[in-house]
C-alpha cells in the first residue's frame, strides 16, 4: 500500500484573519513495507502531514493518492472508510482516549465499527500484549487500574490488532520507562519486517530514528527539506544544526572519538551495537 503526496498544501482557518499554512507544496512518496521517520521542530508540519495519511485532513490544494484513491478537498467522507481501516494512527498520549472498563472491550471497540472478525482481532491483541509483558488475564483487567505505561501499550495494541497496512505512531514512547520503550519499539520493528507493514514514526528521539528507520523525512516550516537514510542524514551535522535537529547519542560519541584521535571510522554507526563493533575493529587495528 503506497501513499503519494502531490503538491499538497493545507491551510488552517482559511479565509479568516487567523489562517495559517501548515504544510506547503509537499510532494512525497511512501512505499509499502518501509519504516519512515518524520522529524523536525515543533510546528514544522509533522502532525498536519500525518493526518493526511488517512484523510483525517484533506488537502487545501493538491492531492494525496492512498492505495489508488485520489483524495482532494472535494473527496466525500463516504469514500474514506476503507482507508481509515487500512491506515492506523496512534496519536500522542493515546492512553488518554481509553474509556472502556476492560481491556477486552477496549480492543473490541474499533473493530466493531469496521465489522471485523472480533475473535481474530482479540487473538492477535492477546499475543501482542503477551509480547509486551502483560499477564495472561490481561483481557479481563481494567485499564484504569494499570500504570500509565501499561495503558499506553494497550492503546497501541488496540490499533495494531486491527491489522492496518500502514501504522503511524506520533511520539509513541514519550514518557515511557526505558524497558517499556524498548518493548514497544522492538515490537513495531518486528511487525514491519515480518508482516511487511509500512511504519511512519513521528519522533523527537533521534536515537530511535537512527536505530529503527529505513528513511528519514525532515520537515522545516511546513516543507520537506530532506529525505535520506539515517546514516547519510546524521552525517550532515552543519545542516542538522540549521534545522535545529540534534545528533543521536551514538553519533555524538563517534564524532567525539574521531576528533580526539584524529581518525575516521569506515561508516557512521546508527546504534550502540554497531558502534561497539566498529570501535573494536578500530582498536584492534590501532
Swiss-Prot record:
Domain ABC transporter: residue ranges: 3-246
Transmembrane parts of this sequence: none
Primary localisation category: membrane
CDD domains for the chain: ABC_cobalt_CbiO_domain1
PROSITE patterns tied to this protein: ABC_TRANSPORTER_1, ABC_TRANSPORTER_2, CBIO
Binding site for ATP: 40-47
Function: ATP-binding (A) component of a common energy-coupling factor (ECF) ABC-transporter complex. Unlike classic ABC transporters this ECF transporter provides the energy necessary to transport a number of different substrates.
EC number: 7.-.-.-
UniProt topology in membrane: Peripheral membrane protein
Family matches, as InterPro entries: AAA+_ATPase, ABC_transporter-like_ATP-bd, ABC_transporter-like_CS, ABC_transpr_CbiO/EcfA_su, ECF_ABC_transporter_ATP-bd, EcfA2, P-loop_NTPase
GO cellular component, one term: ATP-binding cassette (ABC) transporter complex
Assembly and oligomerization: Forms a stable energy-coupling factor (ECF) transporter complex composed of 2 membrane-embedded substrate-binding proteins (S component), 2 ATP-binding proteins (A component) and 2 transmembrane proteins (T component).
Protein name from the UniProt record: Energy-coupling factor transporter ATP-binding protein EcfA2
Record keywords, A-Z: ATP-binding, Cell membrane, Membrane, Nucleotide-binding, Translocase, Transport
GO molecular function: ATP binding; ATP hydrolysis activity; ATPase-coupled transmembrane transporter activity
Broad class of enzyme this protein falls into: translocase
Family affiliation: Belongs to the ABC transporter superfamily. Energy-coupling factor EcfA family.
Any single Pfam family the record assigns to this protein: ABC_tran
Subcellular compartments: Cell membrane
